[in-house]
Amino acid sequence: AYLSGDAATLIETYLADAGISFDELSDGARLADLQERIIEPLRQYLLQAECSGAFVLLNATAGKNAAEPTRSGLYLQVNGYEADRREIILYRGIPSVGKAHGIMPHRKWRLEAQRNVIRGWDDSHSRSHSYSDPARMPAHTYRFTEIFTLPGMSEKAMLLMLPIRGSDGKALGVCGFEVSESCFARLHSQTTKLSHFTGLLTYDDDSHMDGDSIISFFSCGADDGYYRAPGGVLAVSDFGDGILKLTGDDNTYLGMKRSYNDARTGGSFATFVMTNKSDYDSAAMDTIVKNLLLIALLTALSIAFCVFFSRSYLAPVLKSLEQLKRDEQRAHRG
């Protein structure tokens, strides 16, 4: 919400200083001036947040004759997630503005963002459409997009989107943050004793889960050691005793699922905690072997105890009884 409010203030301040309306922004020089004001605050938001990208995209474009609708603005990404080395790059925006601040264009850079691939653009506006006063917009006006692949990128991402609305309620654009699958894997790695722990996050809906298959998801592993992300579609089946079997292109997992709803955004999510089936089978075999050894040991101890008891206690008693019996027989004969 802070990013949305600050972006609206920066936009309206620039419009007032330039003496123009928002509808007159569709000019390269004016858009460059506005991006110059936005880029440093946006970079600070990105550096402070645990995410892989941050953006401010406007309901304005310099390419009105483009074949596909685009929107001007800034979209910054983090190149590397180490705390002491976080390079910021320009994914969308005017390159001269970025270079002036030491931010170089991404190798898949484009000037503007295609509106049809920024998932949730229209929905972000519709959620806040009835609030003419932005200060009265509730927190649930933000939303998470589906997990998808950004144009030109190789990995999947999810966006948290908020509408930008002026003091008069006018829709100025959208802003928010990006979480890529590699960023998710780093932030949510777990401390565990499992050799090959794997965690999944996905939407519990038809666009991400096709019947008994998981189509699109984020994954994470243990915070130490090697981690290999599951590949392809994961087919889900019942393994018994509340355990699920998940079969991928190159591995099979066993795990458990938990579903939950986000009341503020209306999203339904599902998390899976899994381990390799081969690890489970190995652990199960180890348990069987240990149980057999324990049974054999207990049996041997029982036999040894019986032998010891018979020799130490039972044999003398029987010998005494036998002696008494012989004594009685001699007494009767005498």
Where are these regions (language model features)?
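Extracytoplasmic/periplasmic ligand-binding sensor regions of membrane-associated signaling proteins
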Residues: 94-176
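Extracytoplasmic/periplasmic sensory segments of membrane signal-transduction proteins
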Residues: 1-132
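HAMP-domain connector/hinge
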Residues: 329-334
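Cytoplasm-proximal transmembrane signaling helix
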Residues: 202, 270-328
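Conserved beta-strands of PAS-like sensory domains
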Residues: 152-190, 268-279
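Short, hydrophobic beta-strand elements of compact beta-sandwich sensory domains
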Residues: 173-181, 246-287
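A short, hydrophobic, proline-anchored segment that marks a local hinge/packing element in signaling
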Residues: 158-168, 254-265, 316
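Intrinsic low-complexity, intrinsically disordered coil/linker regions enriched in small/polar
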Residues: 182-266
